[in-house]
């Protein structure tokens, strides 16, 4: 290796990221997972991490709400709301009746989105509770951010006219998302796991860059990886800006009708 040809220079991801900033990250969590190693997820620590990665605002959900107590976790998050935090409500899919009531309460509080944690709550896409919550969220005009395998979790939202962001779309399963989303204009995906050489470009070519939203899952995943993939993609500058927050702003900060 030689310095002259650049091969001996250490890899500098930030040099490749350049001036890219994220206006709104669609996948951020406050709190910790009690059953795994990881950061405590204190709000001030998470916001500091985001700032260090040029992420100016985030759609944030509470792991306390997802894993322990829905209402107190949601209330704690709503109380923390700041310009850089878009609060995202959480419901318990194991309690569909209570979940529907919580959706009504969240909507009345002005919350614009709800996040589903099917894997953490042990709920499968075919359970009646998921379809029930999907219908109620659509009726209330709430944007749904959902985990789970997109090959299964697209089904409960089909035909509802809902705005849904699939947070766990892996590039292995991108084709399934593309064919499902072709008939559902409200289907969107996080870019967190679309880190193959052509996943972003393929999705933009098939559906338009308006269906892609930058997501990091900070602080439990590394924000730099999807940031680097977006910065080095073959998308046009205006498409990159849309993915880096413009699309999320359109969904999550639009005026309520």
Regions found by a protein language model. Name each.
Residues 1-26, 40-57, 224-257:
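Mid-to-C-terminal alpha-helical segments outside catalytic/metal-binding sites
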Residues 19-22, 53-58, 82-88, 109-112, ...:
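Short, well-ordered coil/turn segments that N-cap beta-strands
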Residues 23-29, 33, 37, 44-68, ...:
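Divalent metal-dependent hydrolysis catalytic cores, especially in the metallo-beta-lactamase
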Residues 24-26, 59-62, 88-90, 115, ...:
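Active-site neighborhood of phospho(di)ester-bond hydrolases with catalytic His/Asp-centered motifs
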Residues 27, 50, 77, 106, ...:
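Conserved, mostly hydrophobic/aromatic
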Residues 31-33, 65-69, 94-97, 121, ...:
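Active-site environment of divalent metal-dependent phosphoester hydrolases
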Residues 56, 68-145:
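Active-site gating/metal-coordination segments in enzymes
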Residues 126-213:
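Catalytic pocket-lining loop regions of alpha/beta-barrel enzymes
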């Amino acid at each position: 290796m030689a310095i002259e040809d650049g091969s001996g220079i250490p890899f500098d991801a930030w040099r490749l990221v350049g001036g890219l900033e994220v206006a709104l990250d669609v996948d951020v969590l406050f709190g910790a997972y009690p059953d795994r190693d990881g950061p405590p997820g204190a709000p001030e620590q998470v916001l500091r991490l985001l700032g260090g990665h040029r992420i100016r605002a985030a759609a944030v959900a509470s792991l306390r709400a997802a894993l322990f107590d829905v209402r107190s976790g949601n209330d704690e998050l709503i109380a923390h709301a700041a310009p850089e935090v878009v609060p995202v409500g959480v419901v318990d899919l194991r309690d569909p009746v209570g979940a529907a009531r919580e959706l009504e309460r969240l909507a009345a509080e002005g919350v614009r989105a709800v996040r589903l944690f099917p894997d953490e709550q042990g709920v499968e896409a075919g359970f009646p509770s998921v379809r029930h919550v999907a219908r109620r969220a659509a009726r209330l005009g709430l944007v749904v951010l959902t985990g789970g395998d997109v090959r299964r979790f697209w089904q409960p939202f089909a035909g509802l006219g809902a705005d849904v962001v699939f947070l766990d779309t892996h590039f292995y399963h991108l084709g399934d998302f593309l064919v499902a989303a072709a008939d559902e204009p409200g289907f969107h995906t996080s870019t967190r796991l679309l880190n193959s050489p052509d996943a972003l470009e393929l999705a933009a070519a098939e559906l338009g860059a308006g269906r892609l939203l930058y997501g990091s899952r900070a602080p439990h995943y590394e924000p730099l990886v999807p940031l680097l993939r977006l910065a080095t993609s073959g998308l046009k500058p205006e498409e990159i800006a849309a993915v880096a927050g413009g699309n999320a702003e359109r969904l999550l900060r639009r005026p309520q009708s």
